[in-house]
């Protein structure tokens, strides 16, 4: 069915209040967008990331009388009569089909493919990870996930143990197992991530070699040949003492979720215990790798 979209611009501080106003006026869903496409930095746990200038977009049923909606919104103290807004009729589409059509198998490095379940596998002889795009966790489309997958593809993982610190969907741990790792361990603070990783591991036939833990449950003496952490610069710095002890002597470390402008401070947090490689950049993001001294 067709929809009507109403967009208004405000400050990040007022976005939540105007979101409530749109819902009270009849919106069936709300979306926040950055007006200026500013890079996203770390939110605090549980925080909704908003920007200095934020577009608040309400979606309304096509039968909605938008004059009535505008009249209701004009009564809000943050808006007032004649407030700036844009109303747009959205054409009727098969939105689910259009969303699915945007996702294709993606190749990382020489061997590894990430494939949505509804697409044909491009190369049956390649290392294929079946993973459907989702809203919350990594699927390979973000530059940081791509950087980590390419790094794993270039390693000899046969018989190795790999820790995926901040596992999300489990994409990195599962890729490592498909690339030959004997065992992978996924750690995440979010129980939903643990469940997503478990489901994806079962889909890819590697659940018997994947251990998953919330931080409070992880074994104390846990070690691995390879440790990868695709989280964010702030946590990477703060958790450096914890992450640094996970690789065995001579083990490998891969870090991402870091903007290029943040790379130096993250490198500084690990330089004492690791011999670091040159930083690799992709679309303003970077990957930091090294070997345990």
Curated annotation (Swiss-Prot):
Belongs to the methyltransferase superfamily. PrmA family. Its main location: cytoplasm. S-adenosyl-L-methionine binds at residues 145, 166, 188, 230. GO terms for molecular function: protein-lysine N-methyltransferase activity. PANTHER family: ELECTRON TRANSFER FLAVOPROTEIN BETA SUBUNIT LYSINE METHYLTRANSFERASE (PTHR43648:SF1). CDD domains: AdoMet_MTases (cd02440). The gene is prmA. It catalyses: L-lysyl-[protein] + 3 S-adenosyl-L-methionine = N(6),N(6),N(6)-trimethyl-L-lysyl-[protein] + 3 S-adenosyl-L-homocysteine + 3 H(+). Methylates ribosomal protein L11. Gene3D superfamilies: Vaccinia Virus protein VP39. It comes from the Bacteria. Its EC number is 2.1.1.-. It comes from Salmonella dublin (strain CT_02021853). GO terms for cellular component: cytosol. This is Ribosomal protein L11 methyltransferase. It is found in: Cytoplasm. Keywords: Cytoplasm, Methyltransferase, S-adenosyl-L-methionine, Transferase. GO terms for biological process: methylation. InterPro entries: Ribosomal_L11_MeTrfase_PrmA (IPR050078), Ribosomal_PrmA_MeTrfase (IPR004498), SAM-dependent_MTases_sf (IPR029063).
